[in-house]
Design a protein with these regions (language model features):
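Acyl-donor binding region in acyl/amide transferases
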Residues: 105-179
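Short, solvent-exposed beta-strand-terminating loops
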Residues: 90-106
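Protein kinase-like catalytic core scaffold
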Residues: 87-90, 131
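Generic "edge-of-domain/loop-turn" microfeature
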Residues: 80-82, 99, 171, 201
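Residue-level detector of alpha-helical recognition elements and their boundaries
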Residues: 58, 100-101, 107, 147, ...
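Terminal substrate-recognition subdomain of acyl/acetyltransferases
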Residues: 1-35, 126-129, 154-207
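GNAT/GCN5-related N-acetyltransferase fold signature
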Residues: 75, 92-94, 137
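Short amphipathic alpha-helix that is part of the acyltransferase structural core
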Residues: 5-68, 74-88
């Protein structure tokens, strides 16, 4: 959770635009989209390598994704706009929490390793808060953040507060550097909850 999450919501557009892309300096393109069912296995394997072997069980990951596909946006590279021979290189994942889930998160009672979908809004519904569940975007994050923003759109996500937990000192420093603050206490540390407020949809439209 140590990436520059602050830049996600301020950049979101009014309507979601799945599959947006941009050119890479070294050639080719990078794009984001909802992973296919088959690609979820690759996503899970990458998570175990890049984050931890003891992440949420695969059945939990699939249940969250089925409940709200916006929980996962895959990152892909390809030679050109045809997207032939596209390669999966990473992803962003979120828990789009309803009011009950948000309340549990603030109290420190939400099990984010085994989240129950009853605390997550279904697809198309505006969440009360967004918890950054995981990010794997090695060497491509600066290209991907605007694409994630466009894919989500401001209608459901603009103005929704972002939450994340710092797992490393480097991650905590990066989070503080982009504006995250302790959600429950000013001097929050490792393993504690951080919050970042994003502008409402009206402010995004006016920008």
């Amino acid at each position: 959770m140590q990436n520059k999450d602050r830049e996600i919501m301020p950049l979101v557009e009014e309507a979601p635009k799945p599959g947006t892309w941009t050119s890479l300096p070294a050639g080719g393109i990078i794009f984001v989209k909802h992973p296919s069912d088959a690609e979820m296995a690759d996503l899970y394997a990458l998570t175990q390598v890049e984050i931890s072997p003891s992440v949420a069980p695969m059945e939990v990951v699939l249940a969250v994704y089925k409940h709200n596909p916006d929980s996962f946006l895959g990152i892909y590279t390809a030679d050109d706009e045809s997207r032939k021979n596209a390669k999966f290189v990473g992803y962003y994942s979120f828990l789009h929490l309803n009011k009950e889930g948000f309340d549990l998160l603030e109290k420190g009672s939400l099990d984010v390793r085994h989240p129950d979908t009853k605390y997550i809004v279904p697809a198309g519904e505006r969440p009360a808060a967004i918890y950054v569940w995981a990010i794997v975007a090695r060497k491509v994050n600066r290209f991907v953040m605007p694409l994630i923003a466009k894919a989500l759109g401001a209608q459901n996500y603009g103005g929704v507060p972002l939450y994340a937990t710092a797992g490393t000192m480097g991650g905590m420093g990066a989070m503080k550097g982009v504006g995250f603050e302790g959600a429950n206490e000013k001097d929050a540390g490792l393993g504690q909850l951080f919050r970042l407020d994003s502008p409402p949809p009206s402010a995004i439209r006016a920008a």
